[in-house]
Amino acid sequence: MPRPKDLVKGWLGPVTYLLAVLATGQITGDSLLRALVVLAAVELLVYPARYQWNDVRGFVADQHHPASHQRGRLPGPIDKARARVAASGAAAVAKLLVTALLIVLLPGLNLFAPLAFAVSGIFGVAVVYEVLRSTSTGKSDAIPERVRPGVLALWLVVGGGYVVRGMLGVALAVDLTTRPAVAIAAAIALWCYGIAFVTSRWSIEALAFATVLDGRLTWKAGAGQAREHLLTLVRWLPPGTCGSKVDEWAPLRGRTPFGAPWNSAIIAAGAAAALTGRLLSGACPVRQGIIIALLGGVAAVALVWTARREITLLAMGSVIIGAMAMASAPRPVAAALPWLLLMSAYLFFTTRTIRKLDRGSPVGAWAGQLGERVGRLALGTATWQAVRSRGPRSAERQQWAISQPPN
């Protein structure tokens, strides 16, 4: 199963498929069935296999994370590394074999092309990510670290996975071989959105290494924890406005610098998303496309700059819809939806706190409750309680992060 905290990412493929269908006004039963099978295979088989590989590579560093018991990663202790890694690796391979088996068992759905794209894209991005992570982290305990080229490259690469997820949805609804402009605009929008989402989340996760001293944040992390890609981001966080409880602070709720990766990326995503919506709705002259893209970017700037983001989103969304109507888009509201959804997502992830990330989404909570019931039934209450035994509580995790010496 996917990680509960990552379930929100799984909506990207279905949402982009639905957006493309709404914008084009075209759908068939075969298209819907094919999309359901492909997207389910990607989220339930391919991505979990990729995350297991990530957990295997980060096994040792994860054991030293202050929230290791609550992160849902490969469990320790370190002296069980061989057994844990072998079991996780075998499970990952099995999931990929089941994915290949679907292609053979369901030939009428023509699954080879989308699933081959998914596997090659997901693991291609993963290889680059893991190489960059291993060569760019674990070198320094300075906080905030200066923006090194390797860390910057890591921030850029993380958007690639969102391109794979999102473009799968678009490609299952639209023949992108005949509409290359749609493919390019959508890929840029998804890539930039992925960068914004991940870097904003990493900046919040970095607060696990912080404590409050005299109303200001102080940081402590060892180089061996390999978290430079998180901790470099803290340079763009407000310095001392979190009160006394770090885990309840939403540092991105107010204004943060335009140069922060999540802000720069969401502005670019806004421009590309507005253009994508217009292109999906029908033929678009080049000049009109440039104007729509500029309008989407300016509207995103307004959203980043203001402290009253909900009202600004409604106002700018109305402007985008009006512009689509003036541009004679056949379905102006549907054409504006890519921009509206990306900006709504920005509003959501800028309100996150450590506590909210730990709590996860309602869908994740429901999935966790279902898994708990199944686990208790399969293992018995006593064994299940032993398996689910918790580590240190939040306050203890904060103290751990402060007191541990650098590795």
What is each residue range found by the language model?
Residues 3, 7, 129-407:
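C-terminal membrane-associated helical module and adjoining short loops/tails
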Residues 21-27, 106, 132-136:
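Structural signal for the C-terminal ends of transmembrane alpha-helices
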Residues 84-133, 279-299, 303-308:
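Transmembrane helix-loop-helix
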Residues 65-116, 251-270:
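Multi-pass membrane catalytic core of lipid/isoprenoid biosynthesis enzymes
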Residues 59-70, 209-216:
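Interhelical loop segments of eukaryotic multi-pass membrane proteins
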Residues 31-47, 110-122, 176-201:
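Alpha-helical transmembrane segments
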Residues 63-82, 131-149:
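Short, flexible helix-coil linker/hinge segments at the edges of structured domains or between repeats
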Residues 1-59, 63, 82-96, 169-172, ...:
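Topogenic membrane-insertion module of multi-pass membrane proteins
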